[in-house]
């Protein structure tokens, strides 16, 4: 669980300074009073307590106790992503309606899953409250039960793998406008080749040589791209009694190959907000076993899995000061 009050997700900056610089609030209390006012006036919900707030880049998350139970309130000031966020929120509603364990957005009084808030000031109990210093895209989700995935629990990891396969299957059958989502339409051989030529920093030369060799011998992946989660890892997976109870954060959904999404999840599965370490091999194997219990990989996907896992692993190396051992894990 994140600490009470205000905190940062994965950034080593003072949260109070970030809150004021990015959103214009001079205190945690000012921000939570504004959240309470928005919930009352735009969603018809009564906030009883706002216990936690976390800032990540241009985004904020607030945990709220309300008359409708626990809520997770999310907003973003990244205006260039507003259309994408609206689409991903609609996608959440569609997935929840089909039984996928995701938080189903709570509809506002205007009948919307997500609202763009432009008004700087808002009135609550005859008190004028200062809102953010910018337009924000705002959504309200129910808080799901569970704890973040513990990758030492292999049964929970297998359950997470099975859940990812179910998400891929459901996304493939869900009719949504994919035009706003980023698309990885270039062939994998070309994408990886361009990365090797222009972006490989040489931190794991043996792994790079292995990737070059594997890439030279494989045929192009025989699979269509489709919507995938793109950030499936411990920080976005909730479990209870070794079973997946919730998958969070569909804000980074892209159009890509499912096996690439699985390979990326294998590499990053154990990462939380400030604890970034490579995923042990046994854990990766459990994730894949769980996935294939629902959707077995094709022969072409099986050939590509090792290549994609190696590529995502190379991209994960933070730099020369690799204290967590990402390079040695390859």
What are these regions (language model features)?
Residues 1-109, 240-243:
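Conserved NTP-binding catalytic cores of kinases and kinase-like/nucleotidyltransferase enzymes
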Residues 40-48, 191-192, 210-221:
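Short Pro/Gly-enriched beta-strand edge/turn motifs at strand-loop
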Residues 54-68, 72-73, 105-107, 215-260:
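Active-site acidic catalytic loop and adjacent metal/ATP-binding pocket
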Residues 66-176:
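ATP-binding pocket architecture of kinase catalytic cores
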Residues 111, 134-151, 193-198, 311-326:
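A glycine-centered beta->alpha junction motif in the catalytic cores
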Residues 148-203, 223-225, 255:
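A cross-family kinase active-site recognition segment
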Residues 259-295, 309-325:
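Active-site activation/catalytic loop segments of kinase-like enzymes and analogous catalytic loops
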Residues 297-309:
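All-alpha amphipathic helical-bundle segments outside canonical DNA-binding/catalytic cores
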